[in-house]
């Protein structure tokens, strides 16, 4: 009887230990996802000139607590290595837009050789099925047809922050970006939700069309965005300093070039159809065009990598 009791007790202890181990692993997994993940964006400016080439390392704090779907989407793309070797393709008055283009040869290609990335190939399989783990939009209300587009956690899409204190633009802030307009898909709708526990709802496609593009805010005057989601900010003083130094480097480069040629501009407008016509099977005609073109930096801003430093 004593031996039987010992066997039973041993089995019970083993079972309890196994349960404790499984619980610990589960808690560890959950603990890996923080409210404020961090990414590191590493870029170079004007790397064709070895005398002035410099690397800028920018650490970003992302706000998963406020924008869960947006943060999950960009973290997954970063983990896929999607952004490695991409460029800033549109340098606007208050932001630099990236995440959608590269060059055939990052060292020698000029502005005319800008080319789009194949987002569809990176996020769907050979059968056309979406391969992303984080899905926030679907073609149907039953959620049987996942899409590789991001649900718009924006006020224009009816999304609101619980306490009303979402992020707004300030120097260095990172936000979602898309060029599509209502005219490009006037009646198209999809189904989406802002987080796993919320109900799916029918929404306009043009507010839920983001794929991989993002912007870094460069303007001096900030403000809120209605169509785009500001989901992160520079994480520390060192990154703020480096971002400021990058802006200074661009300004100094432009001034130096203008001393040699007073007609010099930092960007060149590209309107070539192969560049500004963006393939989109959910748009009315299967694509949309950026009519005003892109203001492409003539001295490349290359994103050499985006890595997740903290989940």
Where are these regions (language model features)?
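Gram-positive cell-envelope targeting signals
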Residues: 1-40
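Cross-family detector of peptidyl-prolyl cis-trans isomerase
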Residues: 31-311
């Amino acid at each position: 009887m004593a031996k039987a009791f010992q066997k039973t007790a041993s089995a019970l202890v083993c079972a309890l230990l196994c349960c404790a181990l499984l619980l610990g692993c589960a808690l560890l997994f959950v603990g890996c996802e923080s409210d404020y993940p961090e990414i590191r964006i590493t870029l170079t400016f004007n790397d064709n000139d070895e005398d002035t080439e410099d690397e800028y390392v920018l650490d970003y704090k992302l706000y998963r607590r406020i924008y869960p779907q947006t943060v999950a989407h960009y973290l997954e793309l970063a983990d896929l290595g999607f952004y490695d070797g991409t460029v800033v393709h549109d340098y606007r008055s208050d932001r630099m837009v990236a995440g959608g283009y590269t060059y055939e040869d990052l060292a020698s290609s000029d502005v005319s050789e800008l080319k789009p990335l194949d987002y569809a190939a990176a996020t769907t399989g050979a059968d056309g099925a979406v391969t992303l783990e984080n899905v926030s939009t679907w073609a149907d209300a039953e959620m049987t047809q996942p899409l590789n587009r991001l649900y718009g956690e924006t006020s224009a899409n009816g999304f609101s922050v619980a306490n009303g204190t979402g992020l707004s633009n300030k120097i260095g802030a990172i936000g979602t970006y898309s060029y599509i307009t209502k005219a490009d898909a006037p009646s198209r709708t999809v189904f989406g939700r802002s987080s796993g526990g919320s109900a799916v709802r029918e929404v306009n496609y043009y507010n839920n069309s983001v794929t991989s593009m993002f912007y870094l805010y460069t303007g001096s005057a900030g403000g809120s965005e209605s169509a785009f989601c500001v989901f992160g900010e520079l994480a520390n003083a060192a990154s703020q300093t480096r971002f400021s130094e990058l802006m200074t480097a661009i300004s100094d480069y432009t001034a130096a070039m203008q001393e040699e040629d007073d007609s010099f501009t930092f960007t060149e407008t590209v309107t070539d159809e192969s560049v500004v016509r963006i393939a989109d099977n959910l748009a009315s005609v299967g694509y949309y065009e950026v009519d005003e073109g892109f203001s492409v930096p003539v001295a490349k801003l290359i994103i050499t990598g985006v890595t997740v430093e903290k989940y």
